[in-house]
Amino acid sequence: MTTIVGSNLPVARPSWDHSRLESRIVHLGCGAFHRAHQALYTHHLLESTDSDWGICEVNLMPGNDRVLIENLKKQQLLYTVAEKGAESTELKIIGSMKEALHPEIDGCEGILNAMARPQTAIVSLTVTEKGYCADAASGQLDLNNPLIKHDLENPTAPKSAIGYIVEALRLRREKGLKAFTVMSCDNVRENGHVAKVAVLGLAQARDPQLAAWIEENVTFPCTMVDRIVPAATPETIQEIADQLGVYDPCAIACEPFRQWVIEDNFVNGRPDWDKVGAQFVADVVPFEMMKLRMLNGSHSFLAYLGYLGGYETIADTVTNPAYRKAAFALMMQEQAPTLSMPEGTDLNAYATLLIERFSNPSLRHRTWQIAMDGSQKLPQRLLDPVRLHLQNGGSWRHLALGVAGWMRYTQGVDEQGNAIDVVDPMLAEFQKINAQYQGADRVKALLGLSGIFADDLPQNADFVGAVTAAYQQLCERGARECVAAL
């Protein structure tokens, strides 16, 4: 079968000598996001410098995870990234991978050996939030998690990413080798701390002396990652094949924008990713708050009020000038003042860029999808900024309409009387409230959900008054008119 290796392509393959690469990074979780983000940054560094930092890719799960590793091997570890802008698409053939491993092919031992090699300086992860096996309530490692139980009983044949890291560090300690940096690249707040808690939790349960050695010798930098990478579908893969002239089963599409902010805290060296657009900083948290409030907060605002206004995607929503203007005003007038950013951060440029990203029609980001799980997203994205304004006397009418938009959305019926498929862990509570209350009484009942609003906001007369008024306006006039009136 013809692959991207042997074909004439309309795009250049990597021109550097692949043999110069060393597997100095072992990456756990070779999913779409990693291939469009960290592996791409590393590729651009290889392209523009004489760096030798290559990646040994590891997938741990059966099924599609194994198929991807097999497909990568069939095409010499090359794959295609399609960066889809509003006007055009740029194709890139990425060549930063040196090896690709899977336990069903290489055994646990093959993966642990790679992690325990002297040249391995970083073990990075994109394993999603559940890959850290944390207890939701305490944030500590869940020792009853089936994968963790298995890894405690079979420490030399682990199944979880955390189990592999702890066993590999034990092997390095035994061999007298320097530790590696554990770098989480998951879209989780303070991800380095989350990784550290999990690794130390398992090490402590295995051997307190090992845990003490890890605490002393391993660093867990936090990172903030940003790029919209929709899950690869047969349609997107075929679309890329049509442009490329050959089928690449590992191909992925993404937006042109990418951002990577990394806490500069490495124990055993690191690539100069800052030469290709990443930022090394002392503290990632301000950048996480910037993303959470300005990007995610305005995304939620557009999702609820856009869906109610009859728009299917975020890009459709911001074709309406009133929505576009309101999202920008929310970011600059109400979210930006709540942030404490390092000197030189241009929040106006960031907000302008976000509006441009939201407007990209080739990324069909559905309002319904972003509206999911609002009970978990609302507190961080919209309610915490409101609290700061209530303390400091700032204006927050866009935030009030955003909260009211969520309340109106959870009624489960749109402005035309059609059912809304509300997806939320608290759906049963919403349905109970919907059956008993309407109007201002419904607002009061929703404010009684302390898991969302805590105890302070329902006691604040200004908050209750503003949200109730915004909700009643939405019910009477509809979302489009309310957004236009802001």
Task: Report each predicted region and the residues it spans.
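Substrate/ligand-engaging "lid" and interaction regions
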Residues: 1-486
